[in-house]
Amino acid sequence: MKNIFKTFIILAASFVMAGCLKSIDDTGFDPQTPNISFSEENLSIDQNGGELKVQLNSNLPWRVTSDAAWLTISDENGLEGKELVLTVAKNRTRKERIATLTAWIIADKPVKMTVSQDPTPAGESFTYYVKVDGDGLAEGFTWETATTLASAMEKAADGDKICVAAGTYTPITLIPGGETEEERTFEIHSNFTIEGGYPADAVTGAVVDPANNETILDGVGSAYHVVVVSAAKDNTPAVLKNVTITGGRTHTANQQTYRQAGENLVDIGLAGGIYIGKANFVMENCKVIANAAALAAGCYISPNAEVTFRQCVFQNNSADSNGGGIWNAGGTLYMYDSVVAQNTCGQQAAGYYSIDSGGTITVSRIYNTLFLENDCTQKNEKRSGGALYIRAGSDAVFVNCTITGNKAGYGAAISGHGTGQEAAKLSNTTFFNCTITGNHANNGGGGLFAYNVGAQITAYNCIVSGNTSSGTAAEAGVMDGVDANRVLVKNSVLGSSLVDATGGPVGGWGFSTSMLGELGYYDNSLTKCFPLVVSADNPAVDQGLSNADLQAVAGGFSPAVDMDLLLSGQNAIQRTKKSIGSYNAK
């Protein structure tokens, strides 16, 4: 009986299913044809920005994107048609800008609309005046009606200038997308100039005097980035002058959490002091001191940025991992008469770090700069790059520089580190007229050191002497198994010898560090250097390359080496005869 009942149930279920299938087959399925469109093809808005509304018509689920960071969309996807709210940032540039919205149901059949925004009118350049006790509601057009720094920076557009009185300023404005107090920063969002160094009680007619009127931008140990440069790259640069940047402290771990500032994705673990996005940026007479970060404690330079530092100091910055002082990740840096000193890191590159980013070559042209007492051994005695750590995809040239007192496991003055593959992009470093002395490596390369075959280091007309190593290659050398020609020292002083164009010793000459004077300011120097002790037996005084020979070997670089600076020396004395090192003998 049970078997008969089970059979009956199975047969009944089969009839029901068959009926359902027949019903489905009879009715069929008629998918909708995708239909999507914007209610407008073009919209425009004035320079001040704000909100726009547009209807997106769609009969099926859709997605929409904007190709511009300055235009955001309330909804990036939906199931059916919807009114979208477009938020447009203020246009502080002198150019009209256009964004394109792209919407689709099927990816290969999108629809588009454009949003154009008026520029800030040409000729409307303003100067704003800022004091510590300024009024945030004041217009800020005179010292007597001074405003706050946050207010002035919010108002400023391309071509404007902000004059800042002496005192200490802390950031109060969140980076775009920021959520916590630590994300407050001074954002240089446009190509304007900030100039500190005016008297605290400045009145109309006050004259800038930075030596007596220190202007401090202070992150008070909590701001992830004291300064963020997010201005769009333009022929006219953003400029920062006569300020001290201090007290930055990024997130303690590199969490790869990003904020969109202009066209830049800013990592909260990078750059406690100053984060430089894809911008044309000039910094003059500034100090970046006592900042901390997971990575790039003092300064981070983004890919495709073009940056100039003049008479700047990067000192006492400390990274938990790589990059104590400056980290250049695919930018072009011109640095003049500056100091990179006493920076530390837990891993590589205490002083200056150069590495390509996504295939973008990192370019460095560094003149008359002192690299002093940078140390990457405090947490791990084997780490590389005390003063300089030059990685794959780098084109670095150092002219008239002094590198002294730096410490590392490998490469106290410089560690060149390529990919380890001969055919890959090299780490290329060239020194002209540099003095490299008094650096110490725990493992190898107190002076010049190539870590692998991907590195090439060449020194012309340099003093490389008085460097030490507890391992190998006190003055210059390579890692075991690496071709010795990866480090070349030509027409220079190397250790106790004068060497010729082949790197071989020149008979009849010797050298010791007693032939160098005390580190200090000499003649017209803006940074400290070692003078030469003038004596008949000091080869650095009248040997080395002639002016013509120097210009010849330095003539093939792009960007070009500045020939005037090449011949002027770190002591800013025109070279009238042969001499070796950063100090031009008289």
Regions found by a protein language model. Name each.
Residues 172-191, 203-208, 282, 308-311, ...:
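Predominantly extracellular beta-rich ligand-binding scaffolds that present long acidic/polar faces
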Residues 150, 171-193, 202-242, 246-280, ...:
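Extracellular beta-strand-rich solenoid/capping regions of secreted or surface-exposed proteins
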Residues 94-107:
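A short beta-strand micro-motif common to beta-rich folds, especially ectodomain repeats
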Residues 131-176, 185, 226:
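Acidic Gly/Asp/Thr-rich repetitive segments characteristic of extracellular carbohydrate-active
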